[in-house]
């Protein structure tokens, strides 16, 4: 039986979100060019054809007008309008990206205050996949799998993953009633190692290396028949 990984695709690219949040210096043209090259062409066209208020409200939806975000909104809008007034945005929106869809990756999220890593993994997995986590067999006897890397924004990140097994007849889809999933996730599915490697963006080398490590680990189990009876049609997915 083929080993498959559960992957999710973000609704928006990380750099589209960073741009709308004003996470750039308005005169750093090289940085801005870099950000736009990592967006999708659809996102670039949205920026080209809409004002900042529309883009902000579409991205953040019901939370867009919350008081705690108004300072960031005003700062980001001022930067956006500066780029527009000085014709910088015109040049940026002429960029043709190599990417047609946002980033693919594994379910993950940010810990709440005082939340344990495993509890965060279970919560975020449920929110992003809409799967009943109680039906998954988490491999608690394994060490967590860590991914340390520098993001496209230049910041250091550390992701902690947990391995879980799931029956291969488990279906996944975007559920309209799951607001968390609808806000953040654009697509979801089971993919072979070969498919998954080709779907992850090539500059995400640490994520590809992580996928390779897990795949080799599972193949080792398969051939040695130590803990998991793969004859029972088992595939695997990752949690964070």
What are these regions (language model features)?
Residues 8-26, 30:
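Short, solvent-exposed beta-strand-terminating loops
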Residues 7, 77-101:
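Eukaryote-specific, low-hydrophobicity, charge-rich regions
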Residues 17, 33-38, 42, 46-47, ...:
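Nudix hydrolase/Nudix homology domain
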């Amino acid at each position: 039986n083929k080993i498959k990984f559960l992957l999710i695709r973000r609704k928006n690219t990380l750099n589209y979100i960073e741009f709308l949040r004003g996470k750039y210096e308005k005169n750093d043209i090289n940085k801005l060019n870099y950000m736009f090259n990592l967006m999708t062409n659809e996102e670039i066209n949205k920026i080209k054809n809409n004002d900042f208020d529309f883009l902000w409200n579409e991205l953040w939806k019901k939370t867009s007008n919350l008081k705690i975000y108004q300072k960031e909104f005003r700062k980001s809008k001022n930067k956006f309008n500066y780029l527009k007034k000085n014709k910088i945005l015109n040049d940026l929106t002429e960029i043709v990206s190599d990417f047609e869809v946002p980033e693919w990756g594994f379910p993950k999220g940010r810990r709440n205050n005082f939340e344990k890593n495993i509890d965060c993994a279970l919560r975020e997995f449920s929110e992003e996949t809409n799967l009943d986590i109680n039906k998954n067999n988490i491999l608690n006897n394994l060490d967590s799998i860590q991914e340390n890397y520098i993001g496209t924004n230049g910041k250091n990140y550390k992701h902690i993953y947990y391995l879980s097994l799931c029956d291969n007849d488990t279906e996944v889809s975007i559920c309209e009633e799951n607001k968390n999933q609808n806000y953040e996730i654009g697509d979801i599915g089971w993919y072979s190692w070969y498919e998954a490697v080709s779907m992850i963006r090539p500059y995400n080398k640490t994520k590809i290396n992580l996928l390779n490590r897990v795949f080799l680990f599972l193949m080792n189990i398969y051939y040695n028949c130590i803990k998991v009876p793969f004859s029972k049609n088992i595939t695997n997915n990752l949690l964070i």
